[in-house]
Curated annotation (Swiss-Prot):
Belongs to the PNP/UDP phosphorylase family. MtnN subfamily. Inhibited by CBL3 in a calcium-dependent manner. Inhibited by 5'-methylthiotubercidin (MTT) and by formycin A (FMA). GO terms for cellular component: cytosol; plasma membrane. Pathway: Amino-acid biosynthesis; L-methionine biosynthesis via salvage pathway; S-methyl-5-thio-alpha-D-ribose 1-phosphate from S-methyl-5'-thioadenosine (hydrolase route): step 1/2. Optimum pH is 8.0. This is 5'-methylthioadenosine nucleosidase.
Amino acid sequence: MAPHGDGLSDIEEPEVDAQSEILRPISSVVFVIAMQAEALPLVNKFGLSETTDSPLGKGLPWVLYHGVHKDLRINVVCPGRDAALGIDSVGTVPASLITFASIQALKPDIIINAGTCGGFKVKGANIGDVFLVSDVVFHDRRIPIPMFDLYGVGLRQAFSTPNLLKELNLKIGRLSTGDSLDMSTQDETLIIANDATLKDMEGAAVAYVADLLKIPVVFLKAVTDLVDGDKPTAEEFLQNLTVVTAALEGTATKVINFINGRNLSDL
């Protein structure tokens, strides 16, 4: 049982702290990015250096780049290469792990999950578009039991950034996440039911961890392929990856320049 006394001040203090955090200028940004090809244009743009003695943990494949741009400490975190296959560790599990480790070790003011995605042309997406995500869901966690079905969908809002959206004139839409590049019939049914515009393999997992640890998160997603288009997804993805990651870097740079000197409530 809590002791008697001035309990009111104990209750109010976290609210004051939370308010001061919102009004304090943003000083630390972490980018969570799944693929090296998606990350390197941003790393090169800001002249970031790879950390050799990573605070994220010893003996892990995770890659951390760090540096300073204007008044911001910028960290870019990637899950690195699969030890057996040598390819990027894409998908929800690696994304969840590096998001958790990054928040714990780097204590960012805000997380930006930047990467490529599939888009639906019926929802207005085009190759090369960079979207600011409104909210995220999963499309491959099918649990047909009351309440568990909602848990499976996992709807979460991105941090609201109306001023950023207006300044950069970005498209906005819902992102649906699953662990497959292709889209099964069941996936498609849920994506349509959830009214998603974009499809990726990490976003909702990053959102889950950010929500768990109460860190604001925004999502920048650049369209490499049209899920409802005529070309095979894998072929179109690889064909457009280089050009689209350049577009992603350009938008991410504008986002960083907008964030600099502002607090969370300014976004």
